[in-house]
């Protein structure tokens, strides 16, 4: 049993190490933390050569008309962005319902909150745009029930840390694949929000939908759940602004009952693409988004004409 004991020890060690770093980072003013994060990201740009090459290749597929200089400039900014995200995640517990508006602008969120107050349940389709943990944390501070799905991590200590962090803003976390997850998901949707991050090519049932003009395998499970439960859907993304604050953005809510899960998945992916085009340096281009996984491909992509528009942001009223 040495193996399980060692894994348990390592998991706890990771949790306490990350928690200690977070406690230290929480004491640093946000602008100072972002400055250190940019420096860390610049270092990563120079050191992580494999990730840099992959990111440059992927952004070249998405923006073939860009010059090499523009691609390199954007990917360098991407590394800096993710360096800042690390410090911001550590800093998140400083946000409260009283202080959130100082650092966060809400775009279109009030429409969804009013529908929740009227008894509607939602599936929130989200992506790794901007600081996605900032998005879930600040939506959690709005006072309506939010539950997010989380795939099991190899390092359980890190997963435990993220779950604890989200809980500070009232966000619940469900581990994907747990025996109780189907029941918990249905419960979460009733009068609340169930969130999925679904912009990556992972080992789960997926469909090919257009992403920057190329078919990309995208998880279909979130759309299936929305259709089967009769939930409404909304695309949720985050965007960092030049002044260091963030926008937590919900696009226009839409009905999922009776819809086609493939078309909904394509619609959501189009919404992600529109946000990425707004701030291309705030998405992880080192991810192999167009990787082929034939064993997980469950259907053919829809035609372009069948994909409804993603919608847009809207009111900036604080929810």
Give residue ranges: language-model regions.
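Short, composition-biased local secondary-structure segments
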Residues: 25-28, 131-136, 185-197
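Catalytic core of membrane glycerolipid acyltransferases/transacylases, capturing the structured
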Residues: 117-177, 203-207, 214
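A generic secondary-structure micro-motif detector
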Residues: 11, 45, 102, 125, ...
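Non-catalytic C-terminal accessory region of glycerolipid acyltransferases
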Residues: 2-9, 47, 72-79, 114-117, ...
